[in-house]
A protein has these predicted regions:
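Bacterial Sec-dependent N-terminal signal peptides
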Residues: 1-28
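Post-HEXXH active-site segment of zinc metalloproteases
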Residues: 139, 154-182
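Long, well-structured alpha-helical subdomains associated
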Residues: 177, 190-238
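Active-site recognition of the HExxH zinc-binding catalytic motif
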Residues: 143-156
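Active-site scaffold of zinc-dependent metalloenzymes
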Residues: 98-139, 155
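A metal-dependent hydrolase signature that marks the N-terminal structural subdomain at the beginning
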Residues: 22-111
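Second-shell loop/turn segments in exported
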Residues: 55-60, 132, 170-174
Length: 238
């Protein structure tokens, strides 16, 4: 039996290698094939009924405490995610915002059991305080949450092997990383929240509270994410 296993191992390794290499992963986001609801340019200072929003987004969506309305509006822009389990969680560590997936749920057959999380750093006295969700105006909050949901749309189209390849390319190939993030910035535009992602990009670059932060990270931000001017140009084309 051991000899058979030894003889089969190179064959199995070859099959696995070929399978992995055959997975073609592109970094670009894809424009949805439906006409989105076009949200107003300004969503702040309106009366919202959270229960009505929950009825639209489904009961499988977690809402972060204190940001329920902004999160629910962002969810509502993504009808393709209505049946997908997603939680938005406040945390005290990590990046300012990060879309993530439960790796074990990715191993299950089909996609109905997959679980995703959007981690929202809410720690005190971080070096990126100016761009934390709590520091942003309401429309900018909706815009950046819509960006994070765009990542989940992308993840949900991949299988387990593809997710692994994507992650490896994301952290090792700058061009892949940049294309993915910059086209994810387009997802709010594609889902009717162009004004909101524009307001986010404008705020984190132009608001007095963010100027110092932006100047220190300008090269990174403008390489991997669209500027407000670039987003405005895209909005005019869409």
């Amino acid at each position: 039996m051991k000899r058979i296993i030894i003889k089969l191992s190179p064959v199995l390794l070859l099959v696995i290698t070929v399978t992995v290499m055959a997975q073609r992963i592109v970094p670009q986001q894809v424009k949805p094939d439906f006409d989105p609801y076009q949200f107003p340019d300004t969503l702040a200072h309106r009366n919202y009924d959270l229960d009505s929003l929950k009825a639209v987004i489904g009961d499988n969506k977690g809402l972060p405490k204190g940001f329920e309305i902004a999160a629910a509006i962002a969810y509502s822009a993504y009808p393709e995610l209505k049946d997908v389990n997603i939680d938005m969680v406040l945390t005290d560590k990590g990046a300012p915002m990060e879309a993530n997936f439960n790796i074990w749920s990715m191993l299950l057959p089909g996609k109905k059991n997959r679980k995703y999380k959007i981690l929202l750093n809410n720690a005190d006295k971080t070096w990126f305080d100016p761009i934390l969700l709590r520091s942003l105006p309401f429309d900018a909050q909706v815009g950046i949450l819509a960006h994070e949901l765009g990542h989940i749309v992308y993840y949900h189209e991949l299988n387990f092997v593809q997710i692994g390849i994507w992650g490896l390319k994301y952290v090792t190939k700058d061009e892949f990383h940049a294309i993915h993030e910059r086209t994810t910035d387009l997802m709010p535009i594609y889902h009717g929240l162009g004004s909101q992602i524009y307001q986010y990009a404008y705020y984190v670059r132009k608001d007095p509270s963010c100027v110092s932060f932006y100047e220190n990270g300008k090269d990174f931000m403008d390489t991997y994410y669209m500027t407000d001017e670039e987003l405005l140009a895209e909005m005019k084309q869409n």
